[in-house]
Amino acid sequence: LQSVEDNVNFFIDPLERCLSKLKLENYVLCGHSLGGYLSANFAMKYGDKLSRLILLSPAGLPPLPSRTIGPKDLPMAMRLIDSAWSSNVTPGQIVRAMGHRGPTMVHRIVRGRFRSLGWNDEQTRVISDYLYHITAAPGSGEFSMNSILVPLVRADTARPGVFAREPLVHKMNFSNRLPVHVLYGDNDWLYHEKECNEAISNLRRDGLEISLNVIPKSGHHLYLDNPKDVNNFILNNNSNT
């Protein structure tokens, strides 16, 4: 699969077949990160049965930055990431290559990232085991990331980010008046405040019914960092009226 469209369809076409068999009508679709980008594309192609779209820290909302720092001028760690991404090396491949050391590495990452949530040892182990096994499983959709997204470092802020090759701000439109809610964490590495707010304003001018909400005390995994506020938002905004 080479084009962005082909890689997006790899995900959303099977989802449509599944939901059609379930005979779902008037439902709310919620997607996170790359899943948010894919959910928006799903709604553009198959949105006639959707009542609402909720995007949690979606990738690819703002436009590509006009000026970026080239790979040769990046710190060594960033150059390695750029090289790996360009070669389509995925986190799953790295975990699988580590063999029996993989579970320990994933456990350490989970324990460090979510230390503030106060999970006990058993909770951390369960989440770590889950993430390890879905990451170490035979690769499939992970190989599409390079075709859909691209890591870039903005020249004006020297801030790294991941952007869509076909940003949502340039393509998001729906045949029906579909309400769209975008949520980011206040410490979310995908939330570029100025650019995301401008994207939302542009989409509103284009006629979309879209809102942007920032969830406090949360990062990219806002549903874990602040589940109360995220859950309350979803439950309070799932009306079909």
Predicted regions and their residues:
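Catalytic histidine-centered segment of alpha/beta-hydrolase-like enzymes
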Residues: 189-194, 218-231
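Short, hydrophobic alpha-helical segments
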Residues: 152, 234-241
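Short alpha-helical functional segments enriched in proximate histidine and acidic residues
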Residues: 18, 221, 237
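Short glycine-rich catalytic loops that host catalytic nucleophiles or stabilize transition states
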Residues: 211-218
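Flexible "cap/lid" subdomain of the alpha/beta-hydrolase fold that forms the substrate-access gate
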Residues: 2-16, 20-21, 25, 30, ...
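Gly/Ala-rich beta-loop-alpha elbow adjacent to hydrolase catalytic centers
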Residues: 31-35, 39
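Short, hydrophobic alpha-helix immediately C-terminal to the catalytic nucleophile
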Residues: 40-44, 145, 231, 235
